[in-house]
Regions:
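Extended, subdomain-level signal for the structured scaffold at the beginning of enzyme domains
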Residues: 1-103
Length: 103
């Protein structure tokens, strides 16, 4: 996502994408965050920046999971959708970060 010209907060949001994600849950949230002046990144947990939604829509993520440190984000957002949620659940880096945060 492009960074808003004027940030309203120092908070950052990692929007995690796995193949089969629900595009409305992921992209509507990204849009609202952008309009609110909150920096968010679409992060692919697959082996490519292109991620396919549960309805076959291809989205290009901003970053690959292997290139980020999830602990630097204020919030992790895990959108629903099948089988996307299973892809997120099965990602060791997400599991570790959720446990580190005590969720």
């Amino acid at each position: 996502m492009p960074t808003p010209e004027k940030l309203a907060t120092d908070a950052t949001v990692a929007i995690m994408l796995a193949d089969g994600f629900e595009e409305v849950e992921a992209l509507a949230v990204a849009d609202v965050l952008y309009r609110a002046g909150v920096r968010s990144d679409l992060i692919s947990v697959t082996d490519a920046r292109h991620v396919t939604s549960s309805h076959g829509i291809r989205v290009v993520a901003d970053l690959m999971l292997e290139d980020v440190d999830l602990s630097t984000y204020t919030v992790l957002f895990l959108p629903g959708g099948m089988p996307g949620t299973l892809g997120l659940k099965g990602t060791p880096a997400i599991q570790a970060e959720v446990l580190r945060r005590g969720w």
